[in-house]
Amino acid sequence: MKIRENIENFERIKLNKVAKFSDESVGRERLEEPDEIRTCFMVDRDRIIHSKSFRRLKRKTQVFIRTYGDHYRTRLVHTLEVSQVARTIGVALSLNEYLIEAIALGHDLGHAAFAHIGEDVLNDFLPGGFKHNEQSVRVAKKIEKNGLGLNLTKEVLDGILNHSGFSNVSKVAGTFEGQVVRFADKIAYVNHDIDDSIRAGILKEDDLPKNIIEILGASGSERIDTLVKDCVFNTIDNIDKGEPRVSLSKEIGDAFVQLRKFLFDNIYLGKYLEDERKKAEFVLEKVIEYYYNNWEEMPDLYRNICEEEGIHRGVTDYVAGMTDDYCTNEFNKIYIPKFVMY
């Protein structure tokens, strides 16, 4: 018997009835022979980790520009924290940890440079709009491996596509594992963005709303502990009641929504970051403008996309894949003179 089959048989014994069993995967767009020692979701996890898009996350901003300090989260650190939170919840619920890990590690592959500023600029540029979750799926299906894509399982792609959205009415993933990643993403970024904001001097601990802190906890570790345990126990209650969905309790969920709103009002859309936001927007807009008018200068992959799907699409794919550093260097290369000739 193959090692993979042993693992799949063990899943039948170990995992919750609502979990996604590896041997019941819907499969991939292109058929492949099963691996001898890894389940299909292990294979997906490994492909994501070894992808170029995953490596570039280390030089993409989460909220604060990386050059401001060594301890601010990058998009890669955020991704790893999401994976950790999601796996903790998933193991407690006896879900498929490998599926959770693959979705979590791949959920932001398509995120643009300069955090959500990049997403907003590309959304204005691309007809039909730009969303990082949709771009993450596109990266996995079409951009990676010079246009061949990673050929991930449909469960992983579904989890990546549906990881966004905060309200209970948002479209959710088709697997419990995907739903767990959706909550883990929010739990991770709300808490680490508070931590980074305090480090940057934008917030003080005393600025956090007292009524929310009394419910969720005063420190980041306390809040994560509260949210993770509430998610686990409330989801178990849902399953026992015949309502198979991942969710927070009303009290914790309402407090969490209020805390997220506080972050939007005071950090993401606050005045402190306004000047830096304008600079990043300017750099992105000028790089986009240049390549829209000179798309023949882009690498072969993106030139081919321009010819097949239009210049807007090809330029969007190229710029969306840029790191903060690469985008800034492109701006300097295009617009800043290296020397002056008399």
UniProtKB/Swiss-Prot annotation:
SUPFAM superfamilies from the UniProt entry: HD-domain/PDEase-like (SSF109604)
Signal peptide annotation: none
GO molecular function, one term: triphosphoric monoester hydrolase activity
Presence of keyword Hydrolase: yes
Domain HD: start-end pairs: 75-190
InterPro entries noted in UniProt: Diverse_Catalytic_Enzymes, dNTPase_2, HD/PDEase_dom, HD_domain, PHydrolase_assoc_dom
Assigned keywords, A-Z: Hydrolase
Gene3D superfamilies, sorted: Hypothetical protein af1432
Keyword Chloroplast: no
PROSITE patterns, A to Z: HD
Family: Belongs to the dGTPase family. Type 2 subfamily.
Name of the molecule in the record: Deoxyguanosinetriphosphate triphosphohydrolase-like protein
Origin species: Clostridium perfringens (strain 13 / Type A)
